[in-house]
């Protein structure tokens, strides 16, 4: 059976940590683990997912939950509550449901204090890792037989009915992910017509029916070129010379959004090298299978700008295509010939210097999974037997996750993000005496996960921002500061600082709190909004050069409603506890941030959410920030409009439900059939509670609470529904812990802020 291990480093000499691997999550297969009954339970969960895969596409993350509940000997002993039609919700009913949720969720905490959870969903994460390991000859070492079975299970589980795969697990079929999944199946040993339910034959038919892989988008062209299934001359240029441009130029990598910079850094190295993996018999077979014409007859120059309509979310402006054409025709031919190839050699050396710097400052985790595989391959190309590559191999397990739908690759983990919200939800429950050990461990995890130092050396020359005092999205080893993760963790530390140390442990040192505030202030823009990773401010026109076809707003850093709201809430709380620290700066920061939130409100009263679905999510965040800063329904028209938006979008069953299509379409779209989603319902509930809806008319809150109470499962869990996370407008992300955190939190706020009748009265 599969088993989740936390905070374990093992004895690998190529593995090192800044805090003894606190927050690390790795899976191992133990053939002797589990009883026959437990193994049967796992198989039942797999079968249930398979049979319902078109109805509920995200996993319920069952495997590790079974493991933890067994290890903790958890049994739900608090009786379940249901609210009948026409029945009032009593204080006792709300308390019982809340206690059941709190006890169940506390049992899912890891020993190091964090809450593990799947953070995956995009279907272009895993195949490049399989391709990279195939090229480097490490596939069978890293992924033995049991791993390969689970990878194939995941691919089969998320194949669409038409034979293709979407950009993410809920998306329509795309050429990019269908081609990658097909290649992955073939590398893992499936025949050209093999796989569950004829998966390969159906996938190949989809590919050929939609123009063959000549229509794959640019990232696909890159990976296929690396693998030997495409010619580099069919790709737009990615010159590594960008890394030796003068820094004052607007298109210098230092001006880019960090993820864009980090993806194209190793891509440009591999492009500059024109690296191609070994041409094996399988590669030759795939050349025949993926095209509608003979491989040797393809005019690669003509397919450079081809992109299947199913993949095309962001059409390239004419000016961008002209730029690529100019580089392709006039620049590249010179840079590959003497004497200009000397410049290319220098550019490649500089690029590799940056790759090594980023690898070392993230303990070889890198900033994310797309970059991880590319940087690992670049290190192998530089030196197949070198320590850099071996240190990359040691960190692959950090990205792997196993659930009832198989093995997948995570974004890189949401340990700190999930734990920050989990702690706030549990504290809001006011059930402190029942969960003291849970709170103490959670506090300890947050304290130990703060980034204590800036990136090494002259980090500004490496285009890095300060990170000291921040929290990451995942764990301390990852190293990359994020403003909203920092703000939410800071809120937790401030809440804990007001509680007895015998309950929650020693409070965080003042200087560490000050470092967090300093980091947040450094990420605020002139318009009052906060960026996520690095200061925003590059020219907006650079977005015209977005080289991807399926993302938007990826070239430069932007401000975000969620980051801004989280920072407001943290700053307001900090100001009350430390009124003398940078008083004027913090007051100005809060004022400007509030103005930013008011400025970006949509005409219908909502806010566009950047990291969750979508207008419901953004509106919950914005309302939290505004009310923390003292705005009310009566003194703030912005808040008034937000309340109107939420009231109007409430469903007939009392809940809220928003389609993920709101994110790419940028227009509020209800779930099909006007059904509700419990996570969306929780966000909307908390937004209304922030605005003191209970004082005006508690009916919408009672209706929503009834839905949450009646939806709770026998164990105290809540059912998994639609995917709720998003990034870059068009790609969804599955936060498996959300279905527990937010209903629990909403019920806690409801019980605390809404007057409820008591049975005893």
UniProtKB/Swiss-Prot annotation:
GO molecular function: beta-amyrin synthase activity
InterPro entries per record: SQ_cyclase_C (IPR032696), SQ_cyclase_N (IPR032697), Squalene_cyclase (IPR018333), Terpene_synthase_CS (IPR002365), Terpenoid_cyclase/PrenylTrfase (IPR008930)
Family matches, as Pfam families: SQHop_cyclase_C, SQHop_cyclase_N
Membrane topology term: Peripheral membrane protein
UniProt PFTB repeat ranges: 98-140, 148-189, 439-483, 513-558, 590-630, 639-680, 701-742
Tree of life domain: Eukaryota
Coiled coil: none
Main function: Component of the oleanane-type triterpene saponins (e.g. ginsenosides or panaxosides) biosynthetic pathway. Oxidosqualene cyclase converting oxidosqualene into beta-amyrin, generating five rings and eight asymmetric centers in a single transformation.
Enzyme nomenclature, EC number: 5.4.99.39
Active site residues per record: 484 (proton donor)
Oligomer status and interactors: Monomer.
Location(s) in or outside the cell: Endoplasmic reticulum membrane
Reactions this protein catalyses: (S)-2,3-epoxysqualene = beta-amyrin
Pathway participation: Secondary metabolite biosynthesis; terpenoid biosynthesis
Enzyme class: isomerase
Family indicated by similarity: Belongs to the terpene cyclase/mutase family.
SUPFAM superfamilies: Terpenoid cyclases/Protein prenyltransferases
Keywords: Endoplasmic reticulum, Isomerase, Isoprene biosynthesis, Membrane, Repeat
Family matches, as NCBIfam families: squalene_cyclas
Any Gene Ontology CC annotation: endoplasmic reticulum membrane
Protein name per Swiss-Prot or TrEMBL: Beta-amyrin synthase 2
GO BP annotations, alphabetical order: triterpenoid biosynthetic process
């Amino acid at each position: 059976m599969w088993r989740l291990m936390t905070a374990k480093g093992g004895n690998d000499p190529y593995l090192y940590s800044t805090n003894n691997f606190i927050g690390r999550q790795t899976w191992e297969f133990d053939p002797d683990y589990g009883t026959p009954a437990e193994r049967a339970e796992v198989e039942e969960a797999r079968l249930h997912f398979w049979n319902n895969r078109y109805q509920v596409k995200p996993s319920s993350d069952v495997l590790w939950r079974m493991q933890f509940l067994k290890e903790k000997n958890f049994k739900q002993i608090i009786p379940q509550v249901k609210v009948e039609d026409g029945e009032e919700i009593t204080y006792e009913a709300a308390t019982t449901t809340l206690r059941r949720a709190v006890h169940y969720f506390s049992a899912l905490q890891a020993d190091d204090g964090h809450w593990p959870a799947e953070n995956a969903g995009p279907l272009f994460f895993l195949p490049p890792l399989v391709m990279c390991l195939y090229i480097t000859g490490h596939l069978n070492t890293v992924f033995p037989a049991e791993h390969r079975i689970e990878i194939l299970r995941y691919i089969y589980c998320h194949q669409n009915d038409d034979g293709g795969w979407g950009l993410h697990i809920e998306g329509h079929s795309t050429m990019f992910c269908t081609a990658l999944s097909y290649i992955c199946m073939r590398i893992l040993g499936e025949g050209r017509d093999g796989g569950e339910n004829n998966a390969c034959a159906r996938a190949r038919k989809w590919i050929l029916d939609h123009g063959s892989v000549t229509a794959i988008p640019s990232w696909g062209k890159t990976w296929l070129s690396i693998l030997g299934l495409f010619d580099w001359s069919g790709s737009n240029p990615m010159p590594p010379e960008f890394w030796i441009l003068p820094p004052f130029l607007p298109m210098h990598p230092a001006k880019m959004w960090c993820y864009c910079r980090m993806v194209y850094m190793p891509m440009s190295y591999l492009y500059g090298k024109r690296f191609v993996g070994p041409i094996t018999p399988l590669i030759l077979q795939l050349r025949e299978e993926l095209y509608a014409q003979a491989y040797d007859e393809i005019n690669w120059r003509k397919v450079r700008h081809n992109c299947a309509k199913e993949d095309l979310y962001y059409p390239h402006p004419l000016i961008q295509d002209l730029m690529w054409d100019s580089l392709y025709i006039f620049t590249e031919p010179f840079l590959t010939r003497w004497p200009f190839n000397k410049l290319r050699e220098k550019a490649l050396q500089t690029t590799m210097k940056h790759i090594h710097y980023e690898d070392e400052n993230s303990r070889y985790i890198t900033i994310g999974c797309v970059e991880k595989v590319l940087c690992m391959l670049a290190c192998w190309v530089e030196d197949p037997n070198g320590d850099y590559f071996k240190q990359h191999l040691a960190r692959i397990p950090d990205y792997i996750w196993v659930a009832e739908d198989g093995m997948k690759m995570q974004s890189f983990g949401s340990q700190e993000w999930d734990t920050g919200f989990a702690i706030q939800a549990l504290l809001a429950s006011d059930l402190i005496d029942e969960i003291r050990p849970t709170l103490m461990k959670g506090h300890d995890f947050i304290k130990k996960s703060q980034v204590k130092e800036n990136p090494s050396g002259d980090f500004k020359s490496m285009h890095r921002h300060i990170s000291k005092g921040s929290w990451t999205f995942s764990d301390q080893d990852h190293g990359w500061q994020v403003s909203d993760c920092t703000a939410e963790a800071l809120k937790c530390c401030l809440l804990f600082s007001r509680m007895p140390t015998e309950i929650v442990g020693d409070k965080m040192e003042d200087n560490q709190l000050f470092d967090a505030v300093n980091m947040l202030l450094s990420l605020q823009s002139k318009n009052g909004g906060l960026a996520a990773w690095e200061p925003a401010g590059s020219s907006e026109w650079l977005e015209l050069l977005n080289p991807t076809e399926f993302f938007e707003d990826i070239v430069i850093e932007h401000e975000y409603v969620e980051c801004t709201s989280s920072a407001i809430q943290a700053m307001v709380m900090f100001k009350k506890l430390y009124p003398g620290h940078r008083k004027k700066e913090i007051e100005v920061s809060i004022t400007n941030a509030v103005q930013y939130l008011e400025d970006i409100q949509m005409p219908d009263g909502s806010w566009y959410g950047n990291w969750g679905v979508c207008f419901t999510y953004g509106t919950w965040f914005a309302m939290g920030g505004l009310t923390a800063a003292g705005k009310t329904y009566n003194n703030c028209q912005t808040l008034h409009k937000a309340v109107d938006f939420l009231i109007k979008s409430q469903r007939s069953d009392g809940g809220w439900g928003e389609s993920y299509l709101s994110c790419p379409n940028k227009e509020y779209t209800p779930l099909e059939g006007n059904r509700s989603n419990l996570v969306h319902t929780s966000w909307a509930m908390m937004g209304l509670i922030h605005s003191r809806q209970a004082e005006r008319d508690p009916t919408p809150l009672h209706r929503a609470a009834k839905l949450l109470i009646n939806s709770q499962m026998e164990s105290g869990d809540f059912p998994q529904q639609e995917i709720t996370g998003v990034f870059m407008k068009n790609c969804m992300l599955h936060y498996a812990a959300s279905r527990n955190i937010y209903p629990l939190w909403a019920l806690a706020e409801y019980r605390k802020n809404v007057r409820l009748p008591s049975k005893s009265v």
